Amino acid sequence: MNAPLPMTATQGNRPTLAELEARDAFAARHIGPDTPEQQHMLKVLGYDSRAALIDAVIPEAIRRRDGMPMGEFTEPLPEEAALAKLRKLAGKNKVLKSFIGQGYYNTLTPAVVLRNIFENPAWYTAYTPYQPEISQGRLEAMLNFQQMVTDLTGLDIANASMLDEGTAAAEAMTLLQRVNKHASNTFYVADDVLPQTLEVVRTRAKPLGIEVKVGPAADAAAAHAFGVLLQYPGVNGDVTDYRAIADAVHAAGGLVVAAADLLALTLITAPGEWGADVAVGNSQRFGVPLGFGGPHAGYMAVKDAFKRSMPGRLVGVTVDAQGNKAYRLALQTREQHIRREKATSNICTAQVLLAVMASMYAVYHGPQGLKRIAQRVHRLTATLAAGLQTLGFTRTNATFFDTLTFETGFNTDAIHAAATARGINLRHAGATRIGVSLDETATRDDVVALWEIFSHGKPLPASLTFDAIEAAAEDAFPANLARTSAYLTHPVFNTHHAEHEMLRYLRMLADKDLALDRTMIPLGSCTMKLNATSEMIPVTWPEFSQIHPFAPLDQTVGYREMIDQLEAMLCAATGYAAVSLQPNAGSQGEYAGLLIIHAYHASRGESHRDICLIPSSAHGTNPASAQMAGMKVVVVACDENGNVDLEDLAKKAELHSKNLAAIMITYPSTHGVFEQGVQQICEIVHQHGGQVYVDGANMNAMVGTAAPGHFGGDVSHLNLHKTFCIPHGGGGPGVGPVAVGAHLADFLPNQDSVGYRRDDNGIGGVSAAPFGSASILPISWMYIAMMGSAGLTAATENAILTANYVAKRLSPHYPVLYTGQHGLVAHECILDLRPLQKETGISNEDVAKRLMDYGFHAPTMSFPVPGTLMIEPTESEALHELDRFIDAMIAIRKEIGRVEDGSFDRDDNPLKHAPHTAAVVTANEWTRKYTREEAAYPVASLRTQKYWPPVGRADNVYGDRNLFCSCVPMSEYAQD
């Protein structure tokens, strides 16, 4: 892999046609180091080949040597051939205009948003903004999203996105249970809630022992539930005045969640104004394509009293070291990476890229533009309703915004067939009912076409003309629900309506951030590798982006073939027997895997097995997921080398033998080494009746070289947004497939509510759509198809090679905390800065912030060990970039040395004051005990290419003590 181009005939060697075809050319572009660079790194490490290095790193007992056959995808496809093959699959899909609704709508993505966000690597290759100083652009965009949701829902505070509406509702249920001291264990769901949402809620409730009751909204108070879920508007279109119901629920000791349509909220009373305590929903119709179900940004907004119990990311406003406004992630102590099994949720990746798109849709249109879109949709719906009633059809919903449900008698199938023939999908609302949901793409012609479809081919009455019916159509939601409160009044939603202004605003935000389009992002455990352009191109093809998740099967043949092929690819890579792509984040894959284990035990009459063993080094999502799955966490100790303490494991497995459900391990370990005893771990747990969950977060170190399904794993989740090249999007989207052994295949998730049943024994839906974030699956398909088995294996080998090269070169300067056999690491390494901090006061945070002055994103801070930095360079970085990072780290170590020898003041030095903004460096007054040049240009190369952090070090304590999670008043900008 990465061989030099073949010599030409004039050079004396005539290349073969196979060499000229260069079928593996993509692998040479994906893998950063070329052959000479690889040989150089191997020489530094003392090995003569990649194979020799890998043999030294990976235990022989688990080493994979079968070449990882993948059927027709074993050999790589050139980029153009892979695109052509995928285009052929896409062509098997049928793109109809879907008026199905049920939470998903056609939408018009503004071209300026599509090109400059969705298709822009400055946005889609960024990471979650844990380092706020180099993330100010997307943090501002996320804050816009929060402001948009807060305004439209009429509540006090919103988070920065949820995975989808179904999981948002499930999270709201558990939130209300946490904050409500009501003795009840019942959660009441109105019978007009979206069916896919109800299924996800039921799935979440079952392991937690929550009883879900379903019935009319009017009966909610009588249920004496701790919480009530109301759909607003309902699935059949009704716009209900819930004021009295909310009052009655509150009087009975309950709390209220509204699942609300954001576009409808521009015209109807906000949930917070009629008594809802929490609002959830989907922002998809704000410019995000259907995508066969995702990815889309769900949302959650709550009353101020519940802000510390809210799940997911929350952007807040703080000040930097100079007292200037800055954005940051707020209240992180409630999240899984800190609170573990006590966290409010297991959410890690959410849907930031899609939330940014939705927020920019609102910025682009502004409040008046959104209202105009909503009014037009409602007017067309009212016109459609009046015409169908003229034709003799009975409408079952007295009120509506955009959705109608009509009685069709025995003509239902014929109407559906006629609609399909005209290129339109309608909602199946029962044997004798049809639902129609209009959206911003609907036209006058669509309304007339629907009249003709319902008329069974008979000519429309002469009196039934669009203009005549439209002129008489009236608003069809209760007058007392007409919205009177203002929304989106902040200048950001009222300024950027000219496209030049919008374009420059997006550019200004992007320029504030560091993403992979500027520099490597060496985040350990995060695998920030190349997201190739050819992989991204198919995502916006209409055949993938414009398909409704509940479209008829015959319209999604290409999607399902692609999904089947991708599942087979992932089975080949992992050694498992079956895969589900439904989980739309790694955390959801974990959760699904644990539910599958529970279902398996229950099928054997052992539902009492509820103990989950988790090593102390585990990622925070592991214990959080176990708690959500109804399991009790028992921590297993790790030894001084970071490995699972086999003696402690054996003791605890024996102690809990009768109730042992599973162990969750990460492999290679979160400490970045291949533990020698992994098979022994699996054997101990299996001997006591448990299942082995192998967290696939570090699968980038195993593809082609080891397989969890071969060395004892029973179930794993994968992160397609790590190992298989889906970009991180600044904090989502992600895909977290769950892969299982043959004995667990029957328990993979269904989505019965929308007709997706994989197996009668399958667990309930864990995502709202049957295939989760389906529209980004082509990214991973393209990556695997273009790499082939040998290319994927070479990628793994190079990921291990680059990590060991970085560790080797940095080890004289920083202690490498953990190594495996032969003193080597896996695909990442941990630098221990604790001794330096003890000696000099310079912390890992100081080093992380100083790296920004050198133009780098910091490695992972304090995970899995406090006071450390974890580095994962991936296979995609060329030697030049690796050396640039290494040189920066060495230069920083020399700066620390100057603190040690006293030539830098212990408190007034470039590390303690990092990062340095242009404003600070160019200020008239400079009183620091080091030079401006030392601050801004610590290495000469920065003079030709310099990134300036837009803010100084963010004050986290101030931000949490003075929590402010809405757009900053313009007066604040004027002061900056």
Curated annotation (Swiss-Prot):
* Modification sites for N6-(pyridoxal phosphate)lysine: K722
Cofactor(s) the record lists: pyridoxal 5'-phosphate
A GO biological process held by the record: glycine decarboxylation via glycine cleavage system
Q: Which Pfam families match?
A: GcvP2_C, GDC-P
Q: Reply yes or no: does the keyword Cytoplasm apply.
A: no
Q: Extract the GO molecular function terms from the UniProt entry.
A: glycine binding; glycine dehydrogenase (decarboxylating) activity; pyridoxal phosphate binding
Q: Which reaction does it catalyse?
A: N(6)-[(R)-lipoyl]-L-lysyl-[glycine-cleavage complex H protein] + glycine + H(+) = N(6)-[(R)-S(8)-aminomethyldihydrolipoyl]-L-lysyl-[glycine-cleavage complex H protein] + CO2
Q: What InterPro entries does UniProt report for this protein, alphabetically?
A: GcvP, GDC-P_C, GDC-P_N, GDC_P, PyrdxlP-dep_Trfase, PyrdxlP-dep_Trfase_major, PyrdxlP-dep_Trfase_small
**Keywords from the UniProt entry:** Oxidoreductase, Pyridoxal phosphate
The family annotation for this protein states: Belongs to the GcvP family.
Q: What does this protein do?
A: The glycine cleavage system catalyzes the degradation of glycine. The P protein binds the alpha-amino group of glycine through its pyridoxal phosphate cofactor; CO(2) is released and the remaining methylamine moiety is then transferred to the lipoamide cofactor of the H protein.
Q: How does it assemble?
A: The glycine cleavage system is composed of four proteins: P, T, L and H.
Q: What is this protein called?
A: Glycine dehydrogenase (decarboxylating)
**Species, as recorded:** Cupriavidus pinatubonensis (strain JMP 134 / LMG 1197)
